[in-house]
Amino acid sequence: MIDTVSKNGGHLASNLGAVELTMAIHRVFNSPEDKIVWDVGHQSYTHKLLTGRLDRFSTIRKEDGISGFTKPEESLHDAFISGHSSTSVSAAYGIAQAMKIDGNENYAVAVTGDGALTGGLIYEGLNNAGKSNTNLIIILNHNDMSISKNVGALAKYLLSIRNKRGYLKTKRAVEKVLTNTPVVGKPIVKVLKTSKDTVKNTVYRKSNNTTIFEDLGFIYLGPVDGHNLEDLEEVLYTAKSYHKPVVVHVNTVKGKGYAPAEKNPGEFHGISKFDIMTGNPEVSSDDCYSTVFGRELLKLALKDQKICAVTAAMKYGTGLQYFSNQLKDRFFDVGIAEQHAVTFSAGLASMGKIPVFAVYSSFLQRAIDQLIHDVTIGKNHIVLGIDRAGIVGEDGETHQGLYDIPLLTAIPNAEIYSPACYEELKMCLNEAIYKCQGLACVRYPKGNDCTSFNKSDLNTSYTFTENHCSDLLLVSYGRIYDELYKAYVLLNNENVKCDILKLTKIFPLENYIIQKSLKYKKIIFFEESSVSGGISQIFGNELLLKNFSGNYYSKGVKGFVKQATIKSILERIGLDCDSMVVYIKNILENDINET
């Protein structure tokens, strides 16, 4: 596992912490008849190794290889799709109820981490499932971390349980004493082993004599050493014997067995290629859109006490570690709780603060109702720093940032920026904070700065580059504007005259841009977003409303995008420079009628 992740990148620390647990699960349960649902999928690598994918494990996260998350189309042993957090209990409960309807006595097993318990969805599932009388077993893998250190009262609550001695050790000690007691000892042990009210019921109790899980209707077992196979198998067999919803609480060490990962589990949660001997990544993450965003936000906040930073358990991923280090009182990590993060930000805004919520595009999808109801209708000014906007690469379908634009443009009065380079990112962040009202969004990609186009005329609106004698206009925004600009240069060098338009503020579109575009006979729009509901459709619609008489073409992303490198994906979907040149030439030569 370590060798493969060092070459391919991936989620290492969480998987190393779940090796023994996964082995025990597969020894006690009968997959795929018993359905094992992995929350997020960050812990599923050993599961893949044990379920027929050892010979393909070197392809994990590679193009045409196995996924870094569970994926039912990949294996019958992957009972449910994973990628986003806190979904396992609801999914496993649904599976358990379906089994019950069918008279199927197999088990539904949800494997979740304590980090997922910072997300609200999992409590909806726990609340609904606890008293259901189904064969549902929830395994809580408690390593005191999600991606970074867990936050909130529930993390402290679980830690208080974690610090108690496990019930199995106590149970065995009692059994040993009783077994050595003449005459009556062994019969008592037999009774204890067959009773559903075993020694575990006296090991851990809070003042009200129950755990939160028992209050919700579950039988609670644990905590158990998650690196002791004997203990794990015993507690899982015990859980099976109840035939009722059970929570098994397991303590593990994130990064177990690999010193660099144990020392820095947050850094080894999701890591790029690295040197096994030192643990050092091949490429530094100090220079990327996320860190540029984080440093610029800190710079602004040092001058303005109203600015606050909010993250949903992604402090390092979104570059907010700089803000956190220097302005702790205005930094808020709310856990894996995007809905709460948005409404919490709206609350800050209602009191005159300027909250900036940095969030991955794919995770923002979970909070659309709050953006509409609590931010926009409520007329609260918040700024979204939408990280990983566009293609993200090896994490595949569940993580591509392709749907924020269709979702956000449906919200009245939202303003959206999509800078094409670091300097524009800084400019857009400043404008979103100080010149916008209501919902202001700045979206930026995974990766590094673009270098091809002329940066002497950067702004937060748009840039036209004209030949003054062209009938063809090329349009784009964000990262792939750099690819389009390279195509533009190549075409003009081949005497294919064309003009180019770079949008920086992509929504709402300025009327002047549409008016200026009406003169062209052909307009071709490229975007790194879902073409359905994308800016290219909005742009085309505005042209039609103004009686555009030319031909309009759009090239964006259709369907779900599978894992590969960003470069390979852009080539595959036709959004790299060479593919753009071919597409444009085909339109000019063959008059392809594609919209």
What is each PLM-predicted segment?
Residues 1-4, 260-276:
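Cofactor-/ligand-binding subdomain signature composed of acidic, glycine-rich
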Residues 3, 11-132, 306-307, 311-312, ...:
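Cofactor-binding active-site loop characterized by glycine-rich and histidine/acidic residues
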Residues 5-9, 217-220, 412-415:
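Short amphipathic alpha-helical interaction patches enriched in hydrophobic/aromatic residues
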Residues 22, 26, 96, 109-113, ...:
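Short, well-ordered alpha-helical packing segments
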Residues 59-91, 101-105, 131-267, 279-326, ...:
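Thiamine diphosphate
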Residues 108, 112-125, 319, 331, ...:
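Extended, hydrophobic alpha-helical segments in both membrane/secreted and soluble proteins
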Residues 273-275, 409-453:
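Helix-enriched interaction subdomains in cytosolic or periplasmic regions
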Residues 334-335, 359-360, 418-421, 527-528:
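Short beta->alpha connector loops at strand-helix junctions that form conserved
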